[in-house]
Amino acid sequence: MTVLQAIVLGLVQGVGEFLPISSSAHLILTPWFFRWPDPGLTFDVALHLGTLIAVVAYFWRDIIELVLSGLGQPRSQDGRLFWYLIVASIPGAIFGVLFEKQAETIFRSPLLIALTLTLMGLGLWWADRVGRKRRQLDDVNLFDGIIVGISQALAIIPGVSRSGITMTAGLLTGMERETAARFSFLMSVPIIAGAALLKLKELPLHEVNLAFIAGVLTAAVVGFLAIKFLLQYLRRGSYLLFTGYRILLAALIVAVFWLRR
């Protein structure tokens, strides 16, 4: 993999991780479209380390306050939210361990990705229409953590989108658009950190080259900008834009797949 390819994939990861369009799907589709070698799941996880840096850099004050409150004052508002986020991370971690092999093989099919992009895009649009969109982060409770956490477990399938499925679940529990996005971003910290640590400890040091580092740094910078954009956009916009994009991308996948037969 060249440095340019790594930078492109880092850009794709930075945008796709936080916008509800599925970073894992785009990391599979980009090499497929351009006929590049598949970088594999380990490089995917390394790029997630870049977006972990992005979310920690953006929310570092919130994260410190949540951790201190969770450990020192677990009954406080921030303390409870900290433990809700931990609970929400458990289903995704379990599914990630149980279905790791499938994530590396059958779940990487372009046609399956086209299907999940479409279905979850429609699901996000529906949730945005029917959700009450009244509840803020201070209103989140344990039930919300469980529901959003269970939904996150489905994100192991490329095309579902971790941010997309958790925002969908958040909207269905009555969260405001921006609140659903913030909760999704904060709960990404433990799940991404866990996945990255598990995979990176298996990574041979000789594979950590300039391309590898360039991809991670690009994902971090672009991811930070993507978070800022989405939170500002959702104050006045809806999720319909992302539904339309997902459906158009799914149609493009099917067309390319058919032409290459």
Curated annotation (Swiss-Prot):
Enzyme Commission numbers on file: 3.6.1.27
One cellular-component annotation, GO: plasma membrane
Catalytic activity: di-trans,octa-cis-undecaprenyl diphosphate + H2O = di-trans,octa-cis-undecaprenyl phosphate + phosphate + H(+)
Keyword Hydrolase recorded: yes
Additional information: Bacitracin is thought to be involved in the inhibition of peptidoglycan synthesis by sequestering undecaprenyl diphosphate, thereby reducing the pool of lipid carrier available.
Organism from which the protein derives: Moorella thermoacetica (strain ATCC 39073 / JCM 9320)
Chief place of localization: membrane
InterPro entries: UppP (IPR003824)
One BP annotation, GO: peptidoglycan biosynthetic process
Name used for this protein in its record: Undecaprenyl-diphosphatase
Keyword Transmembrane helix: yes
